């Protein structure tokens, strides 16, 4: 099948490429590197018919990053390096219909999302990540499913790590694609034990600065 665009699969097929990218960030002074696992849950991987490899991809992604972070921490213990397990938004949305003629339709349920996320996060935790980073959040309901999955995965794996969130806004008014302001988003996740909240993607650092 066609694997173009499936960058996560490189953790299994060409790990040296991912190692080289991590090394360049560490050489540049990065304190935290992200695993190459942004799309590595079965919802997104189903597009490539490799959804059954999700656990392996995440495990490899975490171990590759962990090994390099540890190498650089050993070189300079005064500057410890950390690994964040990258968890993307998937290619589906819980809050909006993909069908303009049927606004009630949803391509995925909360439970389906949570299940896919939990599988991914358990493998990332097993591989040794220091934190879970739920990023490029465009739908608060997707994010809630991911947060729920993270707490479940940590409990199951017996490992509690910081939970980091990063939102993407889709207009200069600072709203997410699902229509929430940043304040509204914060209110919707304030129940969770979140370590940090940031912004990514969107339309660049300069335009994001006011938020």
Please provide the spans of the model-predicted regions:
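Domain-level signal for soluble alpha/beta catalytic cores
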Residues: 1-211
């Amino acid at each position: 099948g066609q694997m173009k665009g499936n960058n996560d699969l490189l953790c299994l097929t060409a790990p040296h490429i991912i190692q080289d990218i991590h090394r360049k960030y560490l050489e540049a002074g990065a304190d935290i590197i992200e695993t190459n696992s942004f799309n590595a849950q079965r919802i997104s991987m189903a597009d490539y018919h490799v959804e059954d490899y999700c656990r392996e991809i995440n495990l490899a992604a975490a171990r590759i990053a962990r090994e390099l972070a540890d190498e650089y921490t050993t070189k300079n213990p005064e500057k410890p390096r950390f690994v964040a397990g990258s968890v993307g938004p998937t290619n589906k949305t819980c809050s909006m219909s993909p069908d303009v003629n049927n606004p009630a339709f949803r391509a995925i349920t909360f439970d389906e999302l949570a299940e896919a996320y939990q599988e991914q996060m358990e493998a990332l935790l097993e591989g040794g990540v220091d934190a879970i980073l739920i990023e490029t959040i465009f739908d608060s309901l997707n994010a809630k499913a991911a947060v729920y999955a993270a707490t479940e995965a940590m409990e199951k794996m017996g490992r509690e790590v910081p939970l980091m969130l990063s939102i993407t806004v889709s207009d200069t008014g600072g709203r997410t694609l699902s229509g929430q302001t940043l304040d509204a988003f914060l209110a919707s996740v304030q129940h969770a034990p979140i370590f940090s909240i940031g912004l990514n993607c969107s339309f660049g650092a300069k335009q994001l600065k006011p938020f």
